């Protein structure tokens, strides 16, 4: 079985994340969308909330599993029997950081590949940080996140449609 791991904080999941999922799901028999537990970040949504949101927006994909992990992504991927880690790239600046991570992962796990997918142009400006900033000023999240995610963000920030 070909297993891929798409790790991230997904705080919140964006249309850019969804684009990468939708394009990578067919590359593997099973795709694990792995929510990182990062104690150093102050998340908008708890890990449990992010898992619930992801399960909701990804329910139409029978070969996707949503899970959580802490520690090194490469260790988690190996524990899951993955053949690859999936990463999305928005800009050259993303590649620079991802390149270092991929080289480190290759050193730690020589048989584990890193698969990069370029985010579609219409999503290249979207990041979870940008979404949270727009939401903090009660701006429209249309086109940035799935509708159910927009509603949950608006609930967190105390404003409606």
UniProtKB/Swiss-Prot annotation:
Q: Which GO terms describe its cellular component?
A: cytoplasm
Q: What is an example of a Pfam family matching this protein?
A: CTP_transf_like
Residues binding substrate are 9, 41, 73, 87
Look up the record and name the cofactor or cofactors this protein needs.
Mg(2+)
Keywords (alphabetical) are:
ATP-binding, Coenzyme A biosynthesis, Cytoplasm, Magnesium, Nucleotide-binding, Nucleotidyltransferase, Transferase
> Part of which pathway?
Cofactor biosynthesis; coenzyme A biosynthesis; CoA from (R)-pantothenate: step 4/5
Protein function: Reversibly transfers an adenylyl group from ATP to 4'-phosphopantetheine, yielding dephospho-CoA (dPCoA) and pyrophosphate.
Q: Provide the protein name.
A: Phosphopantetheine adenylyltransferase
Predominant subcellular localization, coarse grouping: cytoplasm
Q: Name the Gene Ontology biological process terms.
A: coenzyme A biosynthetic process
- Name the family the entry cites: Belongs to the bacterial CoaD family.
What are the subcellular locations of this protein?
Cytoplasm
Q: Tell me the domain of life.
A: Bacteria
Upper classification of the organism: Bacteria, Bacillati, Bacillota, Clostridia, Eubacteriales
**Quick one: which residues bind ATP?**
9-10, 17, 88-90, 98, 123-129
Q: Which reaction does it catalyse?
A: (R)-4'-phosphopantetheine + ATP + H(+) = 3'-dephospho-CoA + diphosphate
Q: Name one GO molecular function term.
A: ATP binding
Q: How does it assemble?
A: Homohexamer.
Site note Transition state stabilizer, residues:
17
Q: What is its EC number?
A: 2.7.7.3
Per UniProt, the enzyme's principal EC class comes to transferase
Species annotation: Desulforamulus reducens (strain ATCC BAA-1160 / DSM 100696 / MI-1) (Desulfotomaculum reducens)
**Which SUPFAM superfamilies does this entry report, sorted A to Z?**
Nucleotidylyl transferase
């Amino acid at each position: 079985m070909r297993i891929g791991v798409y790790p991230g904080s997904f705080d919140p999941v964006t249309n850019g994340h969804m684009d990468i999922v939708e394009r990578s799901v067919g590359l593997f028999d099973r795709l694990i969308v792995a929510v990182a537990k990062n104690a150093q970040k102050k998340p908008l949504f708890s890990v449990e909330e992010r898992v619930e949101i992801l399960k909701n927006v990804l329910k139409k994909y029978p070969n996707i599993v949503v899970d959580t992990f802490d520690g090194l992504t490469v260790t988690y991927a190996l524990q899951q029997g993955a053949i690859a880690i999936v990463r999305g790239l928005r800009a050259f600046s993303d590649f620079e950081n991802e390149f270092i991570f991929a080289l480190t992962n290759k050193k730690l796990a020589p048989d584990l590949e890193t698969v990069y997918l370029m985010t579609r142009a219409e999503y290249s400006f979207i990041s979870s940080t940008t979404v949270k900033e727009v939401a903090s000023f009660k701006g429209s999240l249309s086109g940035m996140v799935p509708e159910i995610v927009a509603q949950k963000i608006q609930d967190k920030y105390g404003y409606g449609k």
